[in-house]
Amino acid sequence: LTEIPLFEEEFLLIRHINDANKPVPNNKELTNMKLLLLEEGHCLRSQTLSFCKVTSVPKNIMEGTALTTLVQMVSSGIGVTLIPEIAVPFETRSAKVSISKFLQQKPKRAIGLVWRKSNPLLRQFNEIAVLLKNLNKTSI
């Protein structure tokens, strides 16, 4: 496989709108909150748990099957969740939630483009990677 790293993306904290003025919790404090995660096997779930530095799944979590579901659960006051920054405008557009960036330890993930070395579209994938890297630089 060929991999080209494109950019790093932060996860943002999604809380009920009534929590907008509360301090942003750190990763340890997050484990004491009602954490809403995607179901077992999803990479965002494992990335969130990794940020919280937990070795086993906390008992106080609830699961959803999609980011939209998690955001709606937050909007209903059920708990808090983390979602990728790139998904925030779409997923939170009509939800009554507050969006916060973490202040110190910032959860993030690497985004890249991966393809088989034998793929006949090698040149096009490289061009797409350059475009995506440049697009990300202009959007910051």
Q: Model-predicted segments: where are they?
A:
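Short secondary-structure boundary/capping segments
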Residues: 2-5, 21, 26-28, 89, ...
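Hydrophobic hinge/microswitch elements
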Residues: 41-100
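Residues at the C-termini of beta-strands that transition into short coil/loop
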Residues: 7-10, 17, 39, 65, ...
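A bilobed periplasmic-binding-protein/Venus flytrap-type ligand-binding module shared by bacterial periplasmic
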Residues: 14-19, 110-121
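Secondary-structure junction motif
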Residues: 21-25, 33-55, 121-129, 136-139
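Short beta-strand-centered segments that line the small-molecule binding cleft or hinge
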Residues: 1-11, 15, 24, 75-78, ...
